[in-house]
């Protein structure tokens, strides 16, 4: 796991090497080396361990996702802001099964740092609304559900929001 700035330095050094290959008229080598530099740039914006954790989470393998996230030792140094948001988002989702208080902390931090996609932000707010509901904070849960409904433009979370509203009537 490289620091985020080291990834950019490596990408720039590889790009300089590719330019040298172009100058030496080794065009195919230069193109191949540029593709290699592109991988480092891609991993600057999309962290490889977070991508692998998402894949494990899609398979409902929480232990595998936790293992991949464990490789990120210092998220502040290794990840850009949005990736830190997703790092906390993934931790919050995994902890919501076992420790609600800890999950709430991670999900709030993820919302504060920001998530790239609106449906991820809506899901985080819906999770927070569920946690607030279990802790008998009805007003906060209602506000979070309203925010999640605004963010859910494609209607992917419509059923979950309806279920939570039905449960809230019982409180």
Summary of predicted features, one role per range:
Residues 43, 80-84, 118-121, 159:
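Residue signature of alpha-solenoid helical repeat architecture, marking inter-repeat boundaries
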């Amino acid at each position: 796991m490289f620091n985020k700035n080291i990834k950019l330095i490596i990408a720039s050094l590889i790009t300089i090497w590719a330019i040298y290959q172009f100058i030496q008229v080794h065009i195919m080598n230069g193109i191949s080396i540029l593709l290699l530099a592109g991988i480092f740039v891609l991993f600057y914006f999309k962290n490889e361990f977070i991508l692998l954790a998402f894949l494990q989470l899609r398979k409902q393998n929480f232990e595998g996702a936790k293992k991949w996230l464990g490789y990120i030792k210092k998220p502040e140094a290794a990840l850009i802001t949005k990736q830190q948001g997703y790092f906390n988002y993934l931790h919050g989702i995994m902890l919501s099964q076992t420790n609600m208080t800890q999950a709430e902390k991670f999900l709030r931090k993820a919302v504060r740092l920001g998530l790239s996609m609106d449906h991820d932000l809506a899901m985080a707010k819906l999770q927070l609304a569920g946690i607030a509901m279990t802790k008998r904070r009805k007003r906060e849960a209602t506000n979070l559900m309203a925010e999640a409904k605004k963010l859910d433009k494609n209607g992917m979370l419509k059923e979950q929001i309806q279920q939570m509203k039905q449960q809230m009537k019982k409180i």
